[in-house]
């Protein structure tokens, strides 16, 4: 049964960077070719990055307590690591496999160039989050660092989807085999008690009328993440725009209308 999320008044879908519509959401059949399935799944991954980045960008000016700042910096550092891990898996496994299979070494050249365009700025943000003490934190500096690479990052996240859909010219099963090889390496990177809580807390289960089954994990995984992996850094996950069940929630540090009343 389809469900639609109850979206809070001030939420990450309102920007500054818009959530992407999936090919499935546009009416394409994910069973018609693996390129449609893969492009739809890739949209979900990209959307979790967008939701997380929107969340920290919108909330950062209102985070003033030292403990809250420490959690914000940790959360953002985890986001940087997660984006890095995703793109590293593409650079090391997916892109070379596609180049070899298609006998076209430049098939993903545009995407690789886009990675390079935002990588330096993303790394500087990660370094800032790792080396800055809560006492030295500046929301102005924090936002400016995101602004320095965000246009390139979000252009890439959007541009990669039609590139994947263009792989429809190749046999569906061959593309599935290539992606399966890449997936085998994704879980090798990062800490489960960091990446999993961030990912599960940025998935809107009601997105596009609740028609998606993403992430493709067994039902009990939500409980494992919520009650086990999320415990260690629980303060950081307050910046997630959803709870661990995929329900959108009010951004904690955004002032409400009640807060702003004299």
From Swiss-Prot:
Pathway: Secondary metabolite biosynthesis. This is Dimeric xanthone biosynthesis cluster protein R11. It comes from Cryptosporiopsis sp. (strain 8999). It comes from the Eukaryota. GO terms for molecular function: metal ion binding. Residues 69-160 are annotated as: Hemerythrin-like. Part of the gene cluster that mediates the biosynthesis of the dimeric xanthones cryptosporioptides. The pathway begins with the synthesis of atrochrysone thioester by the polyketide synthase dmx-nrPKS. The atrochrysone carboxyl ACP thioesterase dmxR1 then breaks the thioester bond and releases the atrochrysone carboxylic acid from dmx-nrPKS. Atrochrysone carboxylic acid is decarboxylated by the decarboxylase dmxR15, and oxidized by the anthrone oxygenase dmxR16 to yield emodin. Emodin is then reduced to emodin hydroquinone by the oxidoreductase dmxR7. Pfam families: Hemerythrin. CDD domains: Hr-like. The hemerythrin-like domain might act as a cathion-binding domain since it binds iron in haemerythrin, but can bind other metals in related proteins, such as cadmium or magnesium. InterPro entries: Dimeric_xanthone_biosynth, Hemerythrin-like. Keywords: Metal-binding.
């Amino acid at each position: 049964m389809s469900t639609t999320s109850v979206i809070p008044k001030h939420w990450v879908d309102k920007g500054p960077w818009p959530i992407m519509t999936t090919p499935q959401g546009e009416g394409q059949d994910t069973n018609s070719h693996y390129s449609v399935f893969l492009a739809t799944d890739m949209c979900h991954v990209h959307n979790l990055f967008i939701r997380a980045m929107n969340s920290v960008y919108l909330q950062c000016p209102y985070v003033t307590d030292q403990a809250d700042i420490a959690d914000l910096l940790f959360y953002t550092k985890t986001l940087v690591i997660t984006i890095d891990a995703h793109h590293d898996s593409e650079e090391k496994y997916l892109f070379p496999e596609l180049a070899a299979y298609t006998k076209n070494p430049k098939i993903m050249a545009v995407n690789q160039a886009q990675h390079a365009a935002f990588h330096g700025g993303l790394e500087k943000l990660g370094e800032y989050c790792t080396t800055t003490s809560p006492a030295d934190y500046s929301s102005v500096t924090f936002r400016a660092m995101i602004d320095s690479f965000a246009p390139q990052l979000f252009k890439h996240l959007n541009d990669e989807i039609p590139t994947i859909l263009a792989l429809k010219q190749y046999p569906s099963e061959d593309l599935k085999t290539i992606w399966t090889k890449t997936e085998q390496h994704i879980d090798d990177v990062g800490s489960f008690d960091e990446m999993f809580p961030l990912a599960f807390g940025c998935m809107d289960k009601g997105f596009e009328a609740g028609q998606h089954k993403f992430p493709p994990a067994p039902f009990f995984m939500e409980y494992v993440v919520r009650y086990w992996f999320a415990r260690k850094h629980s303060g950081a996950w307050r910046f997630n725009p959803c709870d661990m069940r995929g329900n959108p929630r009010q951004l904690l540090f955004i002032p409400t209308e009640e807060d702003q009343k004299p």
